[in-house]
């Protein structure tokens, strides 16, 4: 209950916002229906064109009316009743008459189409003026079949429906013509049309359908506009906040210019996500894109901006903002200063001329009713009814040309428009390598990073694309730095699976935009041995040695110019000779020492027989003593 009370002020505000629409003048778009037989009901009647399927604008269709005995409201599949309305070869198409009630109008037509009907007439069950059969509001399940409805449908009054049923039940063959040739005025050789749209991309099924239509129809719209065959103008529905609520939190979050211009909250949650005022500001920006582009004689640029903004700046990716919009504007070459001037200040307590004009245009004038349905397409001041789909809308536009003045596109199903020839379609391009991300398709140009010579470019396709994977260095050096001087070329591209730019040895920098030569001599990175003399070169260095020496780069040292192997051999020879010499000297010393020691002992032995030696103790001579 507390949560409900919090929302009561906003619910009251919504009531006040929509209350002016109660007096709105809604015009039901009609087509002519002529009964050719039987005579009892022969004549011309009005029918209301259904706002789905594909009405045959500019043409007519003849058929036989059938009223089923079962499933008369067409709320179930006719296959459940083993009923088929497929026409036999040579027979007129089948127009199925069904009753209103119990299910959506679109479901009735879908079930009839699956059973083989060529058109559907829905008989009203209320005695009232004709109304427009619209699609279900925000119904996901119905969206699956609505987009596949291709047959026309129309609502007839209760009284006329009863006449048709009575004639059929009486056994009469009821033949009639559905005529859309006058559904759209066709006074001259130029068609004027307008699309009431919205920049909100989170409002459900209808927003998805609208975005898809804009992307699909862009190519045809630009061909017609560039050829001067049409005059297109976009519009955006806005509301105002009653003066009593302008200071409320709800109005502040949903409105700009102090409550003058408002839009509903995209997520219907005032505490999170984007606010209604964000939508109003973007709507205003898109209106100003059209105005600025129209002043330069290129109003068709609006289609480029809207489709690019949808792709690049979606709400679900949190990119629905001015920064993303500015990047799209820049890529399309739109004057941002003129755009800002057109938008004005959304916080000012003043009327915004652009949005004020939009509010005034919502009110119907002449044969055109008030705009109350979003989206709404108006062709030659008549509201379009039917499926918002390229071929269907193109048929409606072509029916607005005076006879014999239709452009070639109306007489052919082929549409060719090479948008990449104008400003490269606003896509990324590398002029030096003649590579572009712009691809021209039937539905208009697409900005998609290309594959060149087997190398895949990656990026958003609008402002950035770079080669990736093996072989990427063969394409403009992989987007990395490269330079050539005096016959020497260096590149920072590393040919690996990952995208990488790395300055080569001898350079330093980011590898992408700049690599600077490293002064190995000044920074003492090489050639630092005592005998070395250093000289810096571009991307490298030169090192020389004093005297008869040779510089070894890997070891940063100087050696004799004689070959290393010869030097090693001589060193081995000298080592052997030195070893032999030392061995000989040692042997000689040992020999000399031993010989001397032997000779000393022999001499001492001889001398000891004749005289006492200093080292020999004196021995008494007992023989002489006895003789004495």
UniProtKB/Swiss-Prot annotation:
This is Vacuolar-sorting receptor 3. SUPFAM superfamilies: PA domain. Residues 1-24 form the signal peptide. Gene3D superfamilies: 3.50.30.30, Glutaredoxin, Laminin. Vacuolar-sorting receptor (VSR) involved in clathrin-coated vesicles sorting from Golgi apparatus to vacuoles. Pfam families: cEGF (PF12662), PA (PF02225), VSR_TRX (PF25011). The keyword Endoplasmic reticulum does not apply. InterPro entries: cEGF, EGF-like_Ca-bd_dom, EGF-like_dom, EGF_Ca-bd_CS, PA_dom_sf, PA_domain, VSR_TRX. It is a single-pass type I membrane protein. Expressed in seeds, seedlings, roots, leaves, flowers and siliques. GO terms for cellular component: clathrin-coated vesicle membrane; endosome; Golgi apparatus; Golgi cis cisterna; Golgi membrane; mitochondrion; trans-Golgi network. Residues 25-569 are lumenal. GO terms for biological process: protein targeting to vacuole. SMART domains: EGF_CA (SM00179). Belongs to the VSR (BP-80) family. It is found in: Membrane; Golgi apparatus membrane; Cytoplasmic vesicle, Clathrin-coated vesicle membrane; Prevacuolar compartment membrane. Residues 56-168 form the PA domain. Glycans are attached at residues 148, 294, 434. Its main location: membrane. Residues 591-628 are cytoplasmic. GO terms for molecular function: calcium ion binding. Disulfide bonds join 420-438, 427-447, 449-465, 473-493, 480-501, 503-515, 545-558. A motif (Tyrosine-based internalization motif) lies at residues 610-613. The tyrosine-based internalization signal may be involved in trafficking at the TGN.
């Amino acid at each position: 209950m507390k949560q409900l009370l919090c929302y009561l002020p906003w619910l009251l505000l919504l009531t006040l916002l929509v209350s002016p629409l109660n007096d709105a003048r809604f015009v039901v778009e009609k087509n002519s229906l002529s009964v050719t037989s039987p005579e009892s009901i022969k004549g011309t009647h009005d029918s209301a064109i259904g706002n789905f399927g594909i009405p045959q604008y500019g043409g007519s269709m003849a058929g036989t009316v059938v009223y089923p005995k079962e499933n008369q409201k067409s709320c179930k599949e006719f296959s459940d009743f083993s009923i088929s309305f497929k026409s036999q070869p040579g027979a007129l198409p089948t127009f199925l008459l069904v009753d209103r009630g119990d299910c959506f109008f679109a479901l009735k037509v879908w079930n009839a189409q699956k059973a083989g009907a060529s058109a559907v007439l829905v008989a009203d069950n209320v005695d009232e003026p004709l109304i427009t059969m619209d699609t279900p509001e925000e119904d996901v399940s119905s969206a699956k079949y609505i987009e596949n409805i291709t047959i026309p449908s129309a609502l007839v009054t209760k009284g006329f429906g009863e006449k048709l049923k009575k004639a059929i039940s009486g056994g009469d063959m009821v033949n009639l013509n559905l005529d859309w040739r006058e559904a759209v005025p066709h006074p001259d050789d130029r068609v004027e049309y307008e699309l009431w749209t919205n920049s909100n991309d989170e409002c459900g099924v209808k927003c998805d359908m609208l975005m898809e239509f804009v992307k699909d129809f862009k190519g045809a719209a630009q061909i017609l506009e560039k050829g001067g065959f049409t005059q297109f103008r976009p519009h955006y529905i806005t509301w105002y906040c009653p003066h009593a609520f302008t200071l409320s939190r709800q109005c502040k979050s949903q409105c700009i210019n102090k409550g003058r211009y408002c839009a509903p909250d995209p997520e219907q949650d005032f505490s999170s996500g984007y606010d209604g005022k964000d939508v109003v500001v973007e709507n205003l920006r898109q209106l100003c894109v059209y105005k600025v582009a129209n002043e330069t004689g290129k109003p068709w640029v609006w289609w480029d901006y809207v489709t690019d903004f949808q792709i690049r700046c979606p709400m679900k990716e949190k990119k629905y903002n001015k920064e993303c919009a500015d990047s799209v504007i820049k890529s399309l070459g739109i004057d941002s200063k003129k755009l800002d001037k057109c938008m004005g200040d959304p916080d000012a307590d003043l009327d915004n001329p652009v949005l004020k004009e939009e509010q005034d245009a919502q009110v119907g004038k002449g044969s055109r009713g008030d705009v109350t349905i979003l989206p709404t397409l108006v062709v030659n001041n008549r509201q379009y009814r039917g499926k918002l789909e390229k071929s269907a809308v193109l048929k409606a536009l072509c029916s607005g040309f005076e006879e014999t003045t239709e452009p070639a596109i109306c007489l052919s199903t082929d549409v060719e428009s090479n948008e990449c020839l104008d400003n490269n379609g606003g896509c990324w391009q590398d002029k030096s390598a003649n590579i572009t991300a712009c691809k021209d398709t039937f539905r208009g140009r697409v900005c998609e990073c290309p594959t060149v010579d087997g190398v895949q470019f990656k990026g958003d396709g609008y402002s950035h694309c770079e080669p990736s994977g093996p072989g990427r260095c063969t394409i403009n050096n992989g987007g990395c730095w490269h330079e050539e001087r005096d016959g020497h070329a260096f590149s920072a591209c590393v040919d690996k699976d990952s995208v990488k730019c790395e300055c080569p040895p001898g350079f330093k920098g980011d590898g992408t935009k700049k690599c600077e030569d490293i002064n190995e001599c000044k920074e003492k990175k090489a050639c630092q041995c005592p005998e070395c003399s250093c000289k810096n070169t571009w991307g490298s260095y030169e090192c020389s040695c004093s005297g008869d020496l040779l510089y070894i780069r890997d070891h940063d040292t100087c050696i004799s110019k004689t070959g290393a192997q010869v030097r090693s051999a001589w060193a081995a020879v000298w080592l052997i000779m030195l070893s032999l010499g030392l061995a000989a000297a040692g042997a000689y010393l040992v020999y000399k020492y031993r010989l001397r020691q032997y000779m000393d002992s022999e001499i001492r032995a001889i001398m000891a027989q004749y005289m006492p030696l200093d080292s020999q103790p004196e021995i008494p001579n007992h023989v002489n003593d006895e003789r004495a």
